[in-house]
Amino acid sequence: MAHGEPYYSSKPDKDFNFGSTMARRQMTPTMVTKLPKFVRNSPQVYDWIVRGLIFPTTGKTYFQRVVVITGGFEDGTYGSFAFDGREWVEIYPIEHLNLMSSLKLIHKANALQERLRLSQEEKATLTLDVQFLQHENVRLKELISKPEPRKIQMKWIIVGAVLTFLSLIPGGYAQSQTNNTIFTDVIAACKYSTETLTENLDLRIKLALANITISDKLDAVRQILNFAFVPRSHWLRTVFYYIHYYEMWNIFMFVLAIGTVMRSTRPGTDLITLATSHLSGFRMAVLPTIPFHTTMTLWVMNTLMVCYYFDNLLAITMAILAPILGIIFLCFMEDSNYVSQIRGLIATAVLIAGGHACLTLTGTTTSLFVVILTCRFVRMATIFIGTRFEIRDANGKVVATVPTRIKNAAFDFFQRLKQSGVRVGVNEFVVIKPGALCVIDTPEGKGTGFFSGNDIVTAAHVVGNNTFVNVCYEGLMYEAKVRYMPEKDIAFITCPGDLHPTARLKLSKNPDYSCVTVMAYVNEDLVVSTAAAMVHGNTLSYAVRTQDGMSGAPVCDKYGRVLAVHQTNTGYTGGAVIIDPADFHPVKAPSQVELLKEEIERLKAQLNSAAENPSTVITQQPTATLEQKSVNDSDVVDLVRTAMEREMKILRDEINGILAPFLQKKKGKTKHGRGRVRRNLRKGVKLLTEEEYRELLEKGLDRETFLDLIDRIIGERSGYPDYDDEDYYDEDDDGWGMVGDDVEFDYTEVINFDQAKPTPAPRTTKPKPCPEPEAETQPLDLSQKKDKQLEHEQQVVKPTKPQKNDPQPYSQTYGKAPIWESYDFDWDEDDAKFILPAPPRLTKADEIVLGSKIVKLRTIIETAIKTQNYSALPEAVFELDKAAYEAGLEGFLQRVKSKNKAPKKLQRAPEDQGAQNYHSLDAWKSLLEPPRERRCVPANFPLLGHLPIDRPIFDDKKPRDDLLGLLPEPTWHAFEEYGPTTWGPQAFIKSFDKFFYAEPIDFFSEYPQLCAFADWATYREFRYLEDTRVIHITATEKNTDSTPAYPKMNYFDTEEKYLESYGWAPYIREFTRVFKGDKPEVLWYLFLKKEIIKEEKIRNSDIRQIVCADPIYTRIGACLEAHQNALMKQHTETSVGQCGWSPMEGGFKKTMQRLVNKGNKYFIEFDWTRYDGTIPPSLFRHIKEIRWNFINKDQREKYRHVHEWYVDNLLNRHVLLPSGEVTLQTRGNPSGQFSTTMDNNMINFWLQAFEFAYFNGPNKDLWKTYDTVVYGDDRLSTTPSVPENYEERVIDMYRDIFGMWVKPGKVICRESIVGLSFCGFTVNADLEPVPTSPEKLMASLLKPYKILPDLESLHGKLLCYQLLAAFMAEDHPFKVYVEHCLSRTAKQLRDSGLPARLTEEQLHRIWRGGPKKCDG
């Protein structure tokens, strides 16, 4: 092939075409056969080099040329080979930078392909294993023998026997016989009528004269108890006529026997006990002694009762001897069993002896029954004696809002900065040396360095804890060692011997800080910025647009001499640490001998001074050395806060002085027009919404939310003003006045509920070649409506900002630019048909601008439908929408999404179905079918029927997110005990256990005084709800992305779709229907929650259930309670309920400080189990009644029947399960109602007030010394004192009175608030929040229940975790792992808008609302 066609080993080799083409032409078949084993499908570099430069050669052969080939190997190395005429000989490798970069990418691609191949093989193997296991499972099931079911169940035989036994019980009474005739019956009837008429006349006269006495009232009650109101010929009279022949014990025994047969696990033992109780005559007295018995003592009692039936004296003797014999002969048992057996024998002796005495004296055992019950009650009541208590909870998920803050100096500073305008002036030319810069690459990220002397200087935080770093200079990578890091944020790296920079920087001998220059490499581009600097001690500050990767850059004067090292990265304000010649060399530390000598001399001086003046020694004892050795974390925090306070004060003073000329108020200008600056615009604005904060704890925030969060921080610092537009929304007008009681709506009128509200300043983006729509919304564009000063500002920035004047043709764009990810999905025939509208529906602009492209796309669509191959559609539609965007038209994919058509794969609403069967609240009743198989409803709940629904009851999905392959392997494995929930039918059944623990008593009757005190405390605490209003249903707000329940969920996946289709008419119609007196029964939909929980709970099928109601029903609840809920959120800082609480911007510390400032000695953290489900229904209804009493008096009476209907449907819920089963729930506070959290807060507080009165009595003065914060079932309290055995007593009280569950260990009482938890955060020494369960957060990252859409989402989630871990220990495994993951994902992002990581200053602004201060 010499002098023939060039040789290429593969297609990539031909594409790259590295090296000499002449060398490729010299390749012969022998040379090709003997080629080294380079990487398959990789490029090589061919060189044609003089032979004498490679092989030792003399004579004419010196100038002959040989072929040299350079390529890469499988192990990641590369080499060069020369052909000596016979074979390829390896020579010293020749460096080719382009080849090295290409080989690196090829190796990475090959590694990914190999990983994909292994994953596919593993998947195929696992699939085959699953099939084998399925076949084996079927085979084993066939081998299991199925027992023949009994033809007649044994329990029915037992029931028949019991019924026969009870029917033969003698129960007659001897009565006198009377002879009656028809005349005597007529006389008796007339007499009864006359007496009844006389009584009625007397009663009416007394009513007319209002002369009702107490005896009359007692007679009325007596008549009611005697059923005197029942007519003589009523069927109840007949029932009572036959029942009175039986004693009460017989009836009770009959009912108890039936219940025993149906539900008892030991029906034989229970029935024998009933029979022996009846035969012996002890009857009711036996029942209260049952809990004292064991199995053995129960049979002893049954035997003695049978013996008593035949010989009572023998039975009494044996009963008295039984405890004595038991004490002797059962002493071999362990203590717990021994005590239980003896207690049962003593109970037996008391029953036999006492029962015999009662039967002998009175003929019945009723008195013994009363005595035993009284003893049990006294024993139970003595457990709850206590003095004081306070309770606090810890593990809730909180929704965040920003607290209202008063106007202060810092706020005025930012507002003055907004009014100041931009700087003007002319900067001089500066000297820069790009050849003196390099890039420092570490596993944690990249930074900038510069050459000075024999060292490479950079920032210490760029180097981190690494001993060796990679230095990238002019495309080559060198490994260098970190030489020295002083106390400043500076690091000195030894320059490698083979690195020869073209320029070096020198230190400035006469520093001039008036104007500084910062130069650095950002994304391989050199960036330079000049600014005026301010000196603050050993640091500089200047206003530059700092970017990631600039840390460590040199800060030079105008002559190019180094002044400082750039270190701060907050996005706007830059900072640097001044570098001195003394920083280059470490200070020699004194030897150990010298240190010991100094220590001895210092101790001698202290001894001498102590003898002369002891007080002086005490005050002057600490020295510099000891101070450094005794510094703790709190001291460091205080020092940093002091430094930040001093820096901010200096910075504010300097800026105010510079901006003073611009702050003069012009004459004749009131500045109250539409363009005025709203100083209190951020007052009351949420940093995060409640839903977003809850997501933050579980799964992080999305990209847009994080960008808005960072924009708010930057906006505060950069000082862009917010402007009022023409439709400015007055925040003082809360809208309550528009919803009067008698407002009538015309349903035919189209009502526009949109309201213009102020929008934040737009985000500043990089300049683009063509004007973007963001340019039209920049704050400077609105400055034409300002005064002359702002017009001058606009002229200053004119060269750097796009102008609105003279737009070019088609320069405007519609919406956002199309993104390829939105088009890259599996297209089907429906997508292809609906992507383009019919030709008559195209606009004239579409035909003129996009006509040819639309015709081309129609051809592609027709071909795709015929061949059923839609792979070409995404790219074609994307190109069309891209052209439409550039022409200022709406994209066709966006048009399809904006048509509000019914969601895909959902049924359309049946046209023949009436409104009452589709929109009404009880539409489900007409679809209800008879009950069938019970699959997901437990046996102790009724099965009302089945509804046609297509929903899965199995979920075994554990997604595998490929993006997690970018993250490093974790070394901390505590997260493995958590995982995403999966379930089957058993999980639905077990989820109903949340409603059961213990049965509550009638505490309103048993403890009326304590309940009255709890009511007083609740009315006092929530008195700000007085005179709240019912609002109109169209003015309510709720989450419209929720499931609209059945049957609307068959046709719409969200309430938003339902509202778009039908508007407010169904809502108003159903509200009017209820208002007129109708009481429809609402259907709730139940589903299990997909979340991260412990694997043990998943194995036990312990998954939380969620119920949601019809959106119309929820909106009606919002009408009644939205005003109160809004007020509760506004009073978060002063009230106990933290429904509007936010841990951000100092909210957490302010809340904790509130409890600490109370001055009490103890702090209590309290936590319930199954709180929502075990709330007593009577208490829940009572709290709802308290809330309703706060409503305006007129509206309270007008809408009372609506409120009663609403609460009835909360407590008696008809629930639909995904299996189609319909059941009834009558317990707990449903999680899907409109005011779940607010109701839980009030119940939590009411229970605490009840506990206080229970332990301390209704002491109102003492109650005022307590303070508490609650959120749902979370509670954190402070109290002056705590009684002994507080934990045991309060646990027993909740179980026995309210039937609520508090586990041991969930009540924590300490003398310090540090270490206690509230809403998922643990309080540290600085009252800052630390995540209580970081292992759960790590599980949600590495074992998610939902795959993240893209890399930006993963990076945003990591930023959320960095935010949550802000106050964790620096060496905590979770925090270290998050930082490591951020360094990985930041390298893969390109122009995403998200920061590589949140800086320390940004974290402080988010958590504290500003820089770290000395006062916290």
Swiss-Prot record:
Residues 1161-1287 form the RdRp catalytic domain. The keyword Cell membrane does not apply. It catalyses: RNA(n) + a ribonucleoside 5'-triphosphate = RNA(n+1) + diphosphate. GO terms for cellular component: host cell membrane; membrane. The record marks 175-176, 419-420, 664-665, 755-756, 913-914 as: Cleavage. Keywords: ATP-binding, Coiled coil, Covalent protein-RNA linkage, Host membrane, Hydrolase, Membrane, Nucleotide-binding, Nucleotidyltransferase, Phosphoprotein, Protease, RNA-directed RNA polymerase, Serine protease, Transferase, Transmembrane, Transmembrane helix, Viral RNA replication. The modification O-(5'-phospho-RNA)-tyrosine is found at residue 693. Residues 805-814 have a biased composition (Polar residues). Its EC number is 3.4.21.-, 2.7.7.48. InterPro entries: Astro_1A, Astro_p19, Astro_VPg, DNA/RNA_pol_sf, Mamastrovirus_p20, Peptidase_S1_PA, Peptidase_S1_PA_chymotrypsin, Rev_trsase/Diguanyl_cyclase. The active site is at residues 461, 489, 551. This is Non-structural polyprotein 1AB. The gene is ORF1.
